[in-house]
């Protein structure tokens, strides 16, 4: 029969063995499209590529002032208990993107630990799928990122809503 310490230690070990979480920003935590549509005055995705990015670039504080996605504070509160990392792609079309995202993280998540913030090119996200031959978990709204992550051995959660993402995390052992 297991005593209290056996149960306690096995619980600790289970928690320690959970994969590292990586959470995307745009359209998971941050409502990029709502902010972009507002900034360009029409549908960002339907607008000419060069014009839309030129408009975004003119607003130096665009990235740092984006709104939270609905329910994203609840998602962050859950994943942050496990020391979740941020893994977000930056745009090469706007030099304000990286500093703006850093300001958003500092202001909204109070996240300043550079070791937990990874702003990379989209194609580089998959490079974080494994650590020491152990899979990590990516929460991302972009199906291509999830596919690439899984192909590198990671565990991908295609973010469609906060409730489905939280359910997937719970299935993986996050409480």
Segment roles from a protein language model:
Residues 48, 57-86, 94-99:
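Short, acidic loop-to-helix structural element flanking the phosphoryl-transfer center
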Residues 85-95, 102, 106-127:
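A short, structured active-site edge motif that brings together acidic residues
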């Amino acid at each position: 029969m297991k005593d209290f310490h056996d149960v306690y230690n096995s619980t600790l070990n289970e928690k320690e063995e959970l994969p590292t979480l990586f959470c995307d920003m745009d359209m998971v935590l941050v409502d990029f499209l709502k902010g972009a549509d507002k900034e360009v005055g029409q549908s960002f995705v339907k607008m000419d590529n060069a014009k839309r990015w030129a408009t975004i670039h003119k607003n130096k504080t665009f990235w740092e002032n984006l709104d939270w996605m609905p329910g994203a504070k609840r998602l962050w509160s859950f994943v942050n208990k496990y020391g979740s990392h941020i893994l977000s792609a930056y745009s090469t079309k706007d030099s304000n993107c990286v500093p703006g995202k850093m300001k958003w993280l500092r202001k909204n998540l109070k996240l300043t630990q550079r070791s937990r913030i990874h702003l990379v090119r989209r194609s580089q996200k998959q490079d974080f799928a494994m650590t020491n031959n152990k899979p990590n978990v990516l929460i991302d709204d972009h199906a291509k990122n999830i596919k690439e992550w899984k192909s590198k051995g990671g565990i991908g959660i295609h973010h469609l809503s906060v409730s489905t993402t939280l359910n997937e995390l719970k299935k993986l052992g996050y409480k």
